[in-house]
């Protein structure tokens, strides 16, 4: 009511543990309402591009889609072609946008829409937004935070805060030293899908003032693909849930339910890797039927991007491998041949019966959300029978770390004695996660926005 922030209900997006007591199969989470980006004026050029996997990208083309549209498009589910044609026609024929902004999409969705609406709300109140300004340290006086030190246009400046400083700087996922210190193994900054500049600077500054931390070994995990030439991991959330593939370790054996929520899958990876299971990295295996009809990460379905159009640098055992037979694929990708053949036989039987006797893939509403309802008897399982066969390497990555500064119910940062550090607040991934088990979509952004609101309320003393 008091801003341009607008969200809409996701009626069919289930909780990540929908079969647990209190779980729901939809109508809990929300996504930002799409918005016309030209409302930002020239500030549209300052808006960070969406992660390439939250848009349709091919060459210079960069067409956005919503969460609901993404389910259809990324899964190549019935109706995706009609939806794609509608969105693409509107996008490509937007000549005023092409002339002024190149290939940028006028229609902002997902995170871009959320940020754009926040920016517009600030502009409505004539609030200045400084870009290209990096906080380098906190300024404290007698134990109270009174401002920050920053680097702006290559000049060091001090910014005074008369009422308080709110840290909302993301996690420490791009700092390899902090990853080595806190996160489960294996762990590489290059596997993270997060902002390149999330190096924990605010966390380090608060630690210098004696701030307490918690849950530093947790993250918003997801398997990722390491696309050659890209500096971020490509989150694999949908691909391995679709029917017609399975994921194996170096021995060619499955080790976790591919269709379960992405955080739980990677938690399984870490736990089993620590026990000696060679499952990190792991390998998503699919055949020519899957390849023809479904995308896999940045690899579009063969009907849109045949093998001849795949960049040559992608064909590497650390990313994408191909074999005319499963035995040949095993040799190229470095997977145990006998184990892979045995797994194929098992999965093909499960696809026919509709019941995964090993890992219960397809049993829950979340599993089936990214399945294909046209595939029966199990929307998450289809046989792998027709060569050539493919392997996509998956690494244990994340979209951000989930541990950080300990805060109270007003978002005030606490020290190791449990006392408030006056003038210092935190929200988002630089603070300790409220929902570290990731019970459902929005478990990161929901608390981040809530505690940002609570921090502002405490700082201003407003009763709203």
PLM features per residue range, with description:
Residues 7-464:
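Residues forming the flavin
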Residues 2-5:
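Hydrophobic or amphipathic alpha-helical targeting/insertion segments
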């Amino acid at each position: 009511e008091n801003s341009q922030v607008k969200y809409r209900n996701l009626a069919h997006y289930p909780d990540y543990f929908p079969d647990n007591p209190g779980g729901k199969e939809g109508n809990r989470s929300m996504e930002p309402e799409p918005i016309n980006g030209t409302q930002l004026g020239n500030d549209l050029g300052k808006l960070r591009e969406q992660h390439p996997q939250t848009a349709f990208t091919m060459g210079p083309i960069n067409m956005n889609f919503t969460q609901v549209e993404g389910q259809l498009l990324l899964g190549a589910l019935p109706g995706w072609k009609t939806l794609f044609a509608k969105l693409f026609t509107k996008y490509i024929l937007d000549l005023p946008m092409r002339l002024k902004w190149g290939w940028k999409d006028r229609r902002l969705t997902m995170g871009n829409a959320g940020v754009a609406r926040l920016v517009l709300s600030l502009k409505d109140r004539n609030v200045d937004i400084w870009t290209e300004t990096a906080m380098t340290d906190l300024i404290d006086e007698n134990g109270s935070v009174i401002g920050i030190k920053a680097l702006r246009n290559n000049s060091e400046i001090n910014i005074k805060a008369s009422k308080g400083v709110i840290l909302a700087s993301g996690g420490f996922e791009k700092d390899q030293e902090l990853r080595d210190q806190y996160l489960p193994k294996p762990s590489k900054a290059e596997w993270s899908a997060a902002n390149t500049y999330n190096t924990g600077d605010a966390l380090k500054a608060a630690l210098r003032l004696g701030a307490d931390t918690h849950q530093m070994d947790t993250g918003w995990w997801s398997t990722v693909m390491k696309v050659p030439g890209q500096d971020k991991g490509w989150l694999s959330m949908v691909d391995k849930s679709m029917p017609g593939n399975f994921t194996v370790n170096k021995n060619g054996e499955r080790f976790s339910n591919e269709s379960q929520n992405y955080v739980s899958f990677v938690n399984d990876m870490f736990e089993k890797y620590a026990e000696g299971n060679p499952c990190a990295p792991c390998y998503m295996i699919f055949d020519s039927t899957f390849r023809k009809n479904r995308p896999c990460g940045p690899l579009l379905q063969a009907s849109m991007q045949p093998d001849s159009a795949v960049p040559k640098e992608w064909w590497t055992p650390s990313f994408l491998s191909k074999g005319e037979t499963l035995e040949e694929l095993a040799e190229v990708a470095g997977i145990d041949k006998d184990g892979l053949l045995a797994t194929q036989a098992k999965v093909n039987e499960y696809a026919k019966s509709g019941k995964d006797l090993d890992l219960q893939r397809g049993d829950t509403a979340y599993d089936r959300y990214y399945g294909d309802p046209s595939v029966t008897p199990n929307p998450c399982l289809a046989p792998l029978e027709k060569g050539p066969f493919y392997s996509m390497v998956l690494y244990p990555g994340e979209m951000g770390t989930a541990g950080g500064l300990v805060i109270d119910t007003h978002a005030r940062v606490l020290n190791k004695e449990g006392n408030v550090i006056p003038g210092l607040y935190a929200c988002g991934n630089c603070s300790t996660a409220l929902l570290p088990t990731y019970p459902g979509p929005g478990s990161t952004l929901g608390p981040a926005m809530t505690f940002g609101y609570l921090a502002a309320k405490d700082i201003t003393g407003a009763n709203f």
